[in-house]
From Swiss-Prot:
The gene is Gsr. Homodimer; disulfide-linked. The lineage of its organism: Eukaryota, Metazoa, Chordata, Craniata, Vertebrata. Glutathione binds at Y56, R293. This is Glutathione reductase. It comes from the Eukaryota. It comes from Rattus norvegicus.
Amino acid sequence: VNVGCVPKKVMWNTAVHSEFIHDHVDYGFQNCKSKFNWHVIKEKRDAYVSRLNNIYQNNLTKSHIEVIHGYATFRDGPQPTAEVNGKKFTAPHILIATGGVPTVPHENQIPGASLGITSDGFFQLEDLPSRSVIVGAGYIAVEIAGILSALGSKTSLMIRHDKVLRSFDSLISSNCTEELENAGGVEVLTVKKFSQVKEVKKTSSGLELHVVTALPGRKPTVTTIPDVDCLLWAIGRDPNSKGLNLNKLGIQTDDKGHILVDEFQNTNVKGVYAVGDVCGKALLTPVAIAAGRKLAHRLFEGKEDSRLDYDNIPTVVFSHPPIGTVGLTEDEAVHKYGKDNVKIYSTAFTPMYHAVTTRKTKCVMKMVCANKEEKVVGIHMQGIGCDEMLQGFAVAVKMGATKADFDNRVAIHPTSSEELVTLR
């Protein structure tokens, strides 16, 4: 709520407004130039977050739940014990839901790395940076680069390989990279491929970045990016498990510190559970909420088999345009079912919104089907409205719908979503 999906969506909505302003003239509106005021949206965004926090606090109070502010750490004892502010607490059930934290390079890896900020720091910016450099190729990097550039910050996205979102389906990875590069026509955005920041220095005019670019088959080159107002690391997230003294209870973790749990969110210590990003699986707020709810049903309502099914969890990337994806990628489906048992349906088109606009974005869609019955095991799309249209299609995938089920629906015309029920 504070530094995650809620304020991010507010900023994405703001960036979308900026994009639409560029299209107003094409739709017949004159004199639509408008100066963006960062302070106005920051104040409104922060007030919205504050209202939500008050609502959550009121709900906790009404439910007679005591909130203790502080940092918990586990202590030795005959039963699992947590200490907060010098006071010890124990209970038959202890849940660890501490989430994750942004990864920041060590100073011995990249001198001056601490001069940069993370996605948490993005929400503390008091002004729109004039010059921004985002390091990373995941969804957080893509989203923040899109927001800043759309709002007028000259932005560079630094990626180590040739594409962003490389864990997504190849269609999405390629198209999103292409859309980012094409965005330079409206926003001020460049994608620097095969590039890494090697050193950061503070100067009188901002930050100075020393960048190494190593294109395949070519000798690495070193360049300097001066006058950077905002260097943002979006290179991954670490589990927020340091300082918990998990070893005091013998709670098992992986090499990165993620807490190991079974399908019912149990750790290896009886009465201690973990959900959410601290477990390192499906790092999404709704996943943590759903897993916590299922755990509560099991522990307090006697539903012994209550657990979250982690298959076919839908997710959206608030890029420009947005991405929606659920299920297996094409490569994952081939690995699971075999190449001969996988059939792909795909399409690419220009959304009707752009029929009269100079600015263009594409909409791409892919349906991954498996076996003779052509069960739909994956849907991947990027385009205007894909963020909102995914939820319903995700229900169909979860229910085991086939390609024939999609074909038997009457299309809603004219929409982009109709393409998924008319694929050939």
